[in-house]
């Protein structure tokens, strides 16, 4: 059997730090970000289905979110201001991401490729799937800003404002529900969120 470096590469996502140009109270890596995005995307899909008549596969959405930044193990995490400095850079970076995604897919053993390719190649996402993952991605970045600001790090003030505009642009009923039900707790301390459920 031929060896594959696929999971050895993915395990290195934990070595890639997000928000590299900003001072962080707590450094966040791509691996932990991907897990949080997967959990939030799954929640958004479940909320959409249960509350707003949606019909999406919440488990698939979670998997797509888990792999949504996988190509960064080959490209690194390009800071947002650089990535979107102008449309030409954004377009070129998309092309680089596509190449990196294909390179990852090519690492998967051929007999498993049809399982992993649709998770890694974002062109295999439906518009609805892409929208839910993007909403979750933006929500998690926003939550990171809240955490940094709560720790007294005003470096994230402008990022929070920018992300509020992004969330407004991607707004949906399921996002509104998530923001109303789950996000307020991120403003509280551990003691405050533990009050109602003592161990």
UniProtKB/Swiss-Prot annotation:
Amino acids binding a divalent metal cation: 33, 68-69, 137
A cellular component term, taken from the record's GO annotations: cytoplasm
Binding site for substrate: 18-19, 33, 69, 77-80, 137
Enzyme class: hydrolase
Chain segments annotated as transmembrane: none
Cofactor(s) demanded: a divalent metal cation
Pfam families: YfbR-like (PF12917)
Catalyzed reactions: a 2'-deoxyribonucleoside 5'-phosphate + H2O = a 2'-deoxyribonucleoside + phosphate
Cysteine disulfide partners in this protein: none
Sorted UniProt keywords: Cytoplasm, Hydrolase, Metal-binding, Nucleotide-binding
InterPro entries: HD/PDEase_dom, HD_domain, YfbR, YfbR/HDDC2
Source superkingdom: Bacteria
HD domain boundaries: 30-142
GO molecular function, one term: 5'-deoxynucleotidase activity
Residues with site note (Appears to be important in orienting the phosphate for catalysis): 18
Location in the cell: Cytoplasm
Protein family per UniProt: Belongs to the 5DNU family.
Protein name as it appears in the record: 5'-deoxynucleotidase YfbR
Organism of provenance: Escherichia coli (strain 55989 / EAEC)
Lineage: Bacteria, Pseudomonadati, Pseudomonadota, Gammaproteobacteria, Enterobacterales
